[in-house]
């Protein structure tokens, strides 16, 4: 009751009707096994929230807790879209041409070639509906552009992506292509994708800090130059700030589900809610389901 009042005290009376508080008595900690915790802690906040989404008492869910628990709750509580064997987390990363979608960025560390194809289809729908990119280009993350490069997973995935008629597959891409914007959608397994995501975030933060240090330690002319480029620096910092993108979409489950960093501040949560609204209003789940059906029919005909 006290927490409920604290939340509502931050809003005026006109806004109070927009807020409904649902109580839960349990929480899933970061060090717990996600699957076991979701099954045993029926009153955990993420489990309660997922039930509300399943029962259509809300249109989308935003979580900034344990990623593993969020994925497990979505799988057990919502279920997968028919034809999707492995949901994927789709994360937008800034590039020279706009935004590149990377998936999977951490839903599951391993993936079969068939799962990668499903990710490519889901990522294409995301890029087309959420980012308004027509006929998005899809690339398979690899150690070289040649079709013969890569490990067993990459070698087995390439021909499947090449044969998939419902995506615009352009071939293998390397890590540097993500920020160059060579393609719009980059497909990889969750282990590699999560490493890429964390590296990109760390690199962006390091670059901004190094630039600030260079200006502060560079003498009068450097400081003068820093003042002149301050507006541009602010714009760059905003573009590289993960909080501006809100959260990542968990694609492949039956309702809009957004996953944020556990360290997300107010701005990130606000933007994640905006992403969730777009996710629901653009019927991304329904479009993914439709494209998966088309893909399966095409493969059956072949």
What is each PLM-predicted segment?
Residues 15-58:
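Phosphate/nucleotide-donor binding subsite
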Residues 14-20, 165-167, 253-254:
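A short helix-to-beta-strand connector/capping loop
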């Amino acid at each position: 009751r006290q927490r409920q009042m604290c939340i509502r005290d931050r809003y005026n009376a006109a806004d109070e009707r927009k807020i409904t508080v649902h109580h839960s008595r349990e929480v899933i900690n970061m060090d717990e096994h996600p699957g076991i915790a979701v099954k045993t802690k029926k009153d955990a906040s993420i489990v309660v929230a997922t039930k509300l989404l399943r029962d259509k008492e809300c249109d989308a869910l935003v979580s900034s807790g344990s990623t593993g628990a969020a994925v497990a709750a979505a799988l057990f509580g919502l279920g997968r879209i028919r034809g999707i064997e492995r949901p994927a987390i789709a994360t937008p990363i800034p590039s020279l041409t706009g935004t590149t979608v990377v998936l999977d960025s951490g839903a599951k560390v391993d993936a079969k070639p068939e799962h990668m194809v499903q990710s490519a289809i889901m990522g294409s729908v995301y890029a087309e509906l959420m980012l308004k990119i027509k006929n998005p280009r899809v690339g398979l993350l690899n150690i070289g552009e040649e079709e013969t490069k890569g490990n067993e997973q990459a070698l087995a995935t390439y021909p499947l992506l090449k044969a998939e008629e419902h995506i615009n597959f352009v071939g293998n891409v390397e890590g540097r292509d993500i920020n160059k914007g060579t393609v719009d959608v980059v497909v990889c397994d969750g282990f590699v994708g999560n490493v890429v995501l964390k590296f990109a975030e760390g690199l962006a933060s390091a670059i901004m800090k190094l630039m600030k240090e260079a200006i502060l330690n560079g003498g009068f002319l450097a400081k003068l130059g820093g003042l002149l480029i301050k507006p541009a620096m602010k714009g760059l910092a905003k573009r590289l700030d993960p909080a501006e993108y809100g959260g990542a979409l968990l694609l492949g489950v039956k309702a809009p589900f957004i996953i944020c960093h556990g360290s997300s501040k107010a701005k990130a949560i606000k933007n994640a809610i905006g992403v969730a609204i777009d996710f629901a209003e653009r019927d991304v789940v329904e479009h993914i389901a439709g494209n998966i059906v088309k893909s399966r029919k095409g493969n059956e005909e072949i």
